[in-house]
């Protein structure tokens, strides 16, 4: 049952299949087919008055619908106001407002609907877009793709809205047998019955006046028996149908509807009152085409179901099934879709919930994928690559891990290093101290994690003000460095598989000197080098030195103590082989000194390097000697001690278990006696050093 109110949103001056109330003001009327639920108000007195007062209002329909409509005397007043439009023929219609003279042009195309004889769909094209009104229709899957007038340029036209027949838009009617399947079932049953004897008769219990002509014509053609109907007036202009119908009651197939007298039911069940000439009872079966009855079944059934002793149900539908509606709507894909019928037991909202996902308006409303964009940036704090320490609000429990490039080339010649002049502030400002080059930009190299961390800006270290001031007279004398000297980069020591020359081996600290372990240790971040004031002295704790090879600061808490480190620069070779240490300074003569940045980063030696130098015979190089500065707040006693050239032998003794320094002379007995005396009394051995910082190694 149609619930369409007659007007479309895009073209409100047109009324379709509804001719009462507000539709009386329409400029044009359209009728899709001749079923009563689509003809409300068509013969009402108000419509007659409307036609009498207007000369430019017409009813548009198909030629068959016009013939069927005018066969009834009740619609004779429409005879001069009906305009038949041929199927699949685009026709321009003028919509004129007689009061104002306003005129609107639309192009109307009639498409076959497959519902009943003369039923059509209306395709409107005008200034407000393309709109399709289906009326009642039954189209099999894929049939819409063969409608050429729904296509333009090889694809479906851009349809704004579809007003759709949703009679069976219910999952209960997901699949309805096609008309061909129903015809085969009915044909088999009828043939098996009427061939028994002339007294065996079939009655087709059809409730509608139109729509079953498909069954009538096909049964008559297959069995050679005409179908009896009440009247033929409506089909007089349709010879294809008229040929298979008759008003003669003496036939075995009947589709008559209304009895003329009660007596006709005494000897038979036929409405027309047909009886046997011998007054014997006829053997009659009834077949009722229906769809709703099958939709209510909970189990799958056959196309023909026996419901009584002589009654049957045939699944025959004038309307598209649930799956056929979905196929139709998915193919044309309109912007909007509106239901013309509300199925029994459903609501408008439920029907719309089914239609919306098949429309473009719903597809456009769905959230589309797009990158987080500003949303992501709003929730993320972008930090500079050198501001890793600011990632967390709380202090780090462990030292941050620096990233250093590992794909570097090892150049052995960089181990031979000269002292830096004072006129190069970007490389070094403190005498006896050498700084490495700035790290390459992190974005230009691959990285590995380094356990050591220096300052937040490793590539832009500045000399502390305490070192830029006047240097005391006790500082180490500087060499006259070559201005073109190449300063080594500390990252070259991370290359493991390159060849290392003997000259490189001479400049590497031994594993015993570094605490007997080759694994790097964590150190506290030291943002400044040489921050201790002039006059500070270094000392060796006698308590620790008597039990281990560790060099510690008084007041420190192990290896996590914050101590500044520097590397002592070497004297010129021309200065002689002096190995004595005066009151103020200690001047060893190594071949070359190692870069301070190497010590700061506690870099691992290459794999080919002989790090465990346990005797002076294996390696003859003399590495730099490094000592820690005092970290405690108080200054050490001004006691000064000098080491003789026999220090290497004393370190290799059983008391210390430290191998002798390569190329170092043995300390003199008087120096050893002085040291042993200090150790025996538990006093601290203090070496006066100013503006010098040492790196602590295990």
Swiss-Prot record:
EC annotation from Swiss-Prot or TrEMBL: 3.1.-.-
InterPro entries, sorted: DRMBL, RibonucZ/Hydroxyglut_hydro
Keyword RNA-binding assigned: no
Biased composition (Low complexity): 538-551, 641-655
GO molecular function: 5'-3' DNA exonuclease activity; 5'-3' exonuclease activity; damaged DNA binding; single-stranded DNA endodeoxyribonuclease activity
GO term, biological process aspect, one: adaptive immune response
Keywords carried by this UniProt record: Adaptive immunity, DNA damage, DNA recombination, DNA repair, Endonuclease, Exonuclease, Hydrolase, Immunity, Magnesium, Nuclease, Nucleus, Phosphoprotein
Broad class of enzyme this protein falls into: hydrolase
Record region (Disordered): 445-485, 505-595, 620-669
Disulfide bonds: none
Main location per the UniProt record: nucleus
Superkingdom of origin: Eukaryota
Modified residues (Phosphothreonine): 380
PTM notes: Phosphorylation on undefined residues by PRKDC may stimulate endonucleolytic activity on 5' and 3' hairpins and overhangs. PRKDC must remain present, even after phosphorylation, for efficient hairpin opening. Also phosphorylated by ATM in response to ionizing radiation (IR) and by ATR in response to ultraviolet (UV) radiation.
Polar residues bias (residue ranges): 508-521, 552-583
Keyword Isomerase listed: no
CDD domains from the UniProt entry: artemis-SNM1C-like_MBL-fold
Modified residues (Phosphoserine): 385, 650
Composition bias type Acidic residues, residue spans: 449-461
Alphabetized PANTHER family for the sequence: DNA CROSS-LINK REPAIR PROTEIN PSO2/SNM1-RELATED, PROTEIN ARTEMIS
Assembly, per entry: Interacts with LIG4; the interaction is direct. Interacts with ATM. Interacts with BRCA1. Interacts with PRKDC. Interacts with TP53BP1. Also exhibits ATM- and phosphorylation-dependent interaction with the MRN complex, composed of MRE11, RAD50, and NBN.
Name of the molecule in the record: Protein artemis
């Amino acid at each position: 049952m149609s619930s369409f109110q007659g007007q479309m949103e895009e073209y409100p001056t047109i009324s379709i299949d509804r001719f009462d109330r507000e539709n009386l003001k329409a400029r044009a009327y359209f009728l899709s087919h001749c079923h009563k639920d689509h003809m409300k108000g068509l013969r009402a007195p108000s419509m007659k008055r409307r036609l009498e007062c207007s000369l430019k209002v017409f009813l548009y329909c198909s030629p068959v619908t016009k013939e069927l409509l005018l066969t009834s005397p009740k619609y004779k007043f429409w005879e001069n106001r009906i305009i038949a439009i041929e199927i699949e023929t685009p026709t321009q219609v003028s919509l004129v407002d007689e009061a104002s003279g306003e005129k609107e042009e639309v192009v109307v195309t009639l498409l076959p609907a497959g519902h009943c004889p003369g039923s059509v769909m209306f395709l409107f094209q005008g200034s407000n877009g393309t709109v399709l009104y289906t009326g009642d229709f039954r189209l099999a899957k894929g049939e819409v793709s063969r409608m050429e007038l729904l296509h333009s340029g090889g694809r479906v036209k851009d349809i704004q809205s579809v007003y759709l027949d949703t009679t069976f838009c219910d999952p209960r009617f997901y699949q309805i047998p096609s008309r061909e399947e129903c015809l085969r079932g009915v044909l088999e049953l009828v043939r098996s019955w009427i061939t028994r004897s002339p007294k065996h008769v079939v009655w087709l219990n059809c409730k509608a006046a139109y729509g079953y002509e498909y069954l009538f014509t096909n049964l008559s053609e297959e069995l050679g028996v005409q179908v009896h109907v009440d009247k033929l007036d409506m089909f007089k202009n349709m010879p294809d149908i008229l040929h298979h119908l008759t008003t003669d009651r003496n036939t075995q197939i009947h589709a008559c509807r209304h009895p003329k007298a009660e007596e006709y039911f005494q000897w038979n069940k036929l409405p027309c009152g047909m009886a046997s000439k011998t007054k014997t009872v006829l053997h009659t079966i009834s077949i009722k085409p229906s769809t709703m009855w099958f939709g209510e079944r909970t189990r799958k059934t056959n196309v023909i179901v026996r419901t009584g002793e002589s009654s049957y149900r045939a699944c025959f539908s004038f309307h598209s099934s649930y799956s056929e509606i979905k196929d139709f709507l998915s193919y044309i894909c309109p912007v909007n879709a509106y239901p013309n019928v509300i199925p029994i037991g459903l609501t408008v909202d439920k029907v719309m919930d089914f239609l919306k996902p098949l429309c473009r308006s719903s597809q456009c409303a769905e959230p589309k994928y797009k990158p987080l964009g500003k949303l992501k940036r709003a929730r993320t704090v972008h930090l500079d690559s050198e501001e890793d320490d600011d990632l967390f609000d709380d202090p780090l429990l462990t030292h941050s891990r620096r990233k250093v490039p590992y794909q570097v080339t090892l150049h052995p010649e960089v181990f031979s290093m000269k002292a830096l002049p004072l006129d190069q502030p970007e490389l070094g400002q403190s005498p006896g101290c050498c700084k490495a080059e700035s790290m390459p930009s992190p974005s230009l190299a691959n990285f590995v994690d380094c356990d050591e961390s220096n300052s937040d800006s490793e590539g832009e270290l500045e000399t502390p003000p305490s070192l830029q001031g006047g240097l005391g007279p006790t500082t180490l004398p500087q060499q006259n460095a070559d201005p073109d000297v190449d300063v080594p980069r500390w990252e070259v020591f991370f290359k493991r598989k390159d060849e290392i020359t003997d000259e490189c081996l001479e400049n590497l600290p031994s594993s015993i000197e570094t605490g007997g372990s080759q694994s790097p240790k964590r150190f506290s971040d030291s943002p400044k080098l040489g921050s201790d004031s002039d006059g500070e002295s270094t000392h060796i704790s006698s308590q620790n030195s008597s039990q281990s090879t560790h060099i510690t600061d008084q007041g420190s808490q192990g290896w996590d103590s914050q101590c500044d480190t520097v590397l002592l620069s070497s004297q010129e070779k021309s200065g002689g082989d002096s190995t004595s240490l005066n009151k103020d300074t200690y001047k060893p003569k190594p071949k070359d000194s190692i870069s301070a940045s190497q010590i700061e980063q506690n870099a691992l030696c290459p794999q080919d390097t002989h790090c465990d130098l346990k005797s002076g015979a294996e390696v003859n190089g003399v590495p730099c000697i490094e000592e820690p500065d005092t970290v405690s707040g108080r200054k050490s006693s001004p006691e000064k001690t000098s080491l003789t050239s026999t220090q290497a032998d004393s370190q290799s003794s059983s008391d210390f278990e430290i191998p002798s320094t390569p190329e170092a002379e043995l300390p003199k007995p008087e120096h050893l006696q002085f040291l042993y005396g200090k150790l025996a009394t538990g006093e601290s051995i203090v070496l006066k050093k100013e503006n010098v910082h040492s790196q602590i190694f295990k």
